[in-house]
Amino acid sequence: GYDTVLYDTFKIQESDFSSSRQDLSLVRDSRELDKLAKKYNLIMLASVQLAEYMKGKLFLDASCLSNAKQTKEILENLFLMRTVYAEELDEKSKYYCHPFRLKKINDKWIEEEYKADPNAVWRMLFVEKTRNGNNSSDTGIAYLLKFSGDHSIFREVAQCRPKHGEIR
């Protein structure tokens, strides 16, 4: 059987564009997906596009989503992902994200600097909502993922501290 469903891309249905409250269709649809997940004991993953005007924002949070409050309300976990800008991997740039890996030494975790290959394809993942731990806004930490688009593989390689602000 199945234990995970990926719904790509979660958005307002065309038939709902005539309504003055398009956000209600997102709430309704998210609740239907939630019911299905609970009924069949499924992990339900739904991708949602970031609002276009948020392109260039470095530190992502739920405000990047249209209808953010309604969308976030129903979710158990919310992860936000974006492309990594070249400036974020350049140590001389004011946007450098300071990638690191955790290494255990004498029962203590220390941060070990990580040099990200600037020629690789990278994505940055922000934990916006979790019911079981800290989120990126609490810690200032996001995850650096190496992306292999040919095989749709994301590998968690390091953590980082993205800057707040925008790149245009």
Language-model regions, residue ranges each:
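C-terminal regions of RecA-like/P-loop NTPase motor modules
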Residues: 1-6, 32-40, 52-168
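Short acidic catalytic loops
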Residues: 2-16
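Flexible beta-alpha connector loops of hexameric P-loop NTPases
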Residues: 14-27, 56-63
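Conserved H-loop
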Residues: 46-49
